[in-house]
Amino acid sequence: MGLSGKNVIFVGGLGFIGYEACKQLMAKNMASFFVFDVLDKPENIKALQALNPKTKVYYTKFDITSKQSIKSALADVVAKVKYIDALINGAGILTDPNVELTMNINLIGLINTTLEGLPLMDKNKQGRGGVIVNIASVLGLEPCPPAAVYCASKFGVMGFSRSIGDPYYYNITGVAVVTFCPGLTETPLKNNIGSKYTFEYSKKISEELNSTKTQKPEVCGAHLAQVVESHENGGIYISNQGTLAKVTPTVYWQPTYH
């Protein structure tokens, strides 16, 4: 799906990977670009707008842990531009000692934003179809002992995204669901692996993991922008060490419908 003339929302667009992706997306000649974030960085919003005057950039102060904040922010988008064509869910933290906050931001908030946004995009309701890109992690595909809680949240994102990305839903709504899985990327979140781990015993392997090869946020952001345009329902992509690759998950069981 080309983004020219489209209305796009990026939740968590002022983080490191998110902001780099936002800069890439500004080259796509979107009609409107809504950046939702708890961070307030007016200079970054101005910098985005300066990249392409053809795209109107909006900033919304956003609390992903609040259903009311989610509902109000999405309603404001519809009031301004009528249609939502792409929704990117990119808010995330890595702080295993705080289980509730990790789950509320990484998983529950993403679920609530998706469930609130998808009906607004549904071609059978008030939308015209589109794409939702949920940002999971390579740690949503494989376990990582020093970040067990973070892993659990991202495994949840993966299961949720694959479920609502079923062709059954896509054929009805016209809304594709794609999952994007960054590998280790040079951001403060990556650095938290070495300090905000699951157990005291995790320190050694956390530090070892934190010292392995990474990629720049600019590279990961460019990959994310590419995935947003793919519009491939059910697609799962890994961005790791500078390479973007499609993933085909192993299927152990499939539901049978009668």
UniProtKB/Swiss-Prot annotation:
GO terms for cellular component: cytoplasm. NAD(+) binds at residues 9-33. Transmembrane segments: none annotated. Substrate binds at residue 137. Keywords: NAD, Oxidoreductase. The keyword Iron does not apply. The keyword Oxidoreductase applies. Pfam families: adh_short (PF00106). It is an enzyme of class 1 (oxidoreductase). It catalyses: a primary alcohol + NAD(+) = an aldehyde + NADH + H(+); a secondary alcohol + NAD(+) = a ketone + NADH + H(+). SUPFAM superfamilies: NAD(P)-binding Rossmann-fold domains (SSF51735). GO terms for molecular function: alcohol dehydrogenase (NAD+) activity. Its EC number is 1.1.1.1. The active site is at 150 (proton acceptor). Belongs to the short-chain dehydrogenases/reductases (SDR) family. Homodimer. This is Alcohol dehydrogenase 2. It comes from Ceratitis capitata (Mediterranean fruit fly). The gene is ADH2.
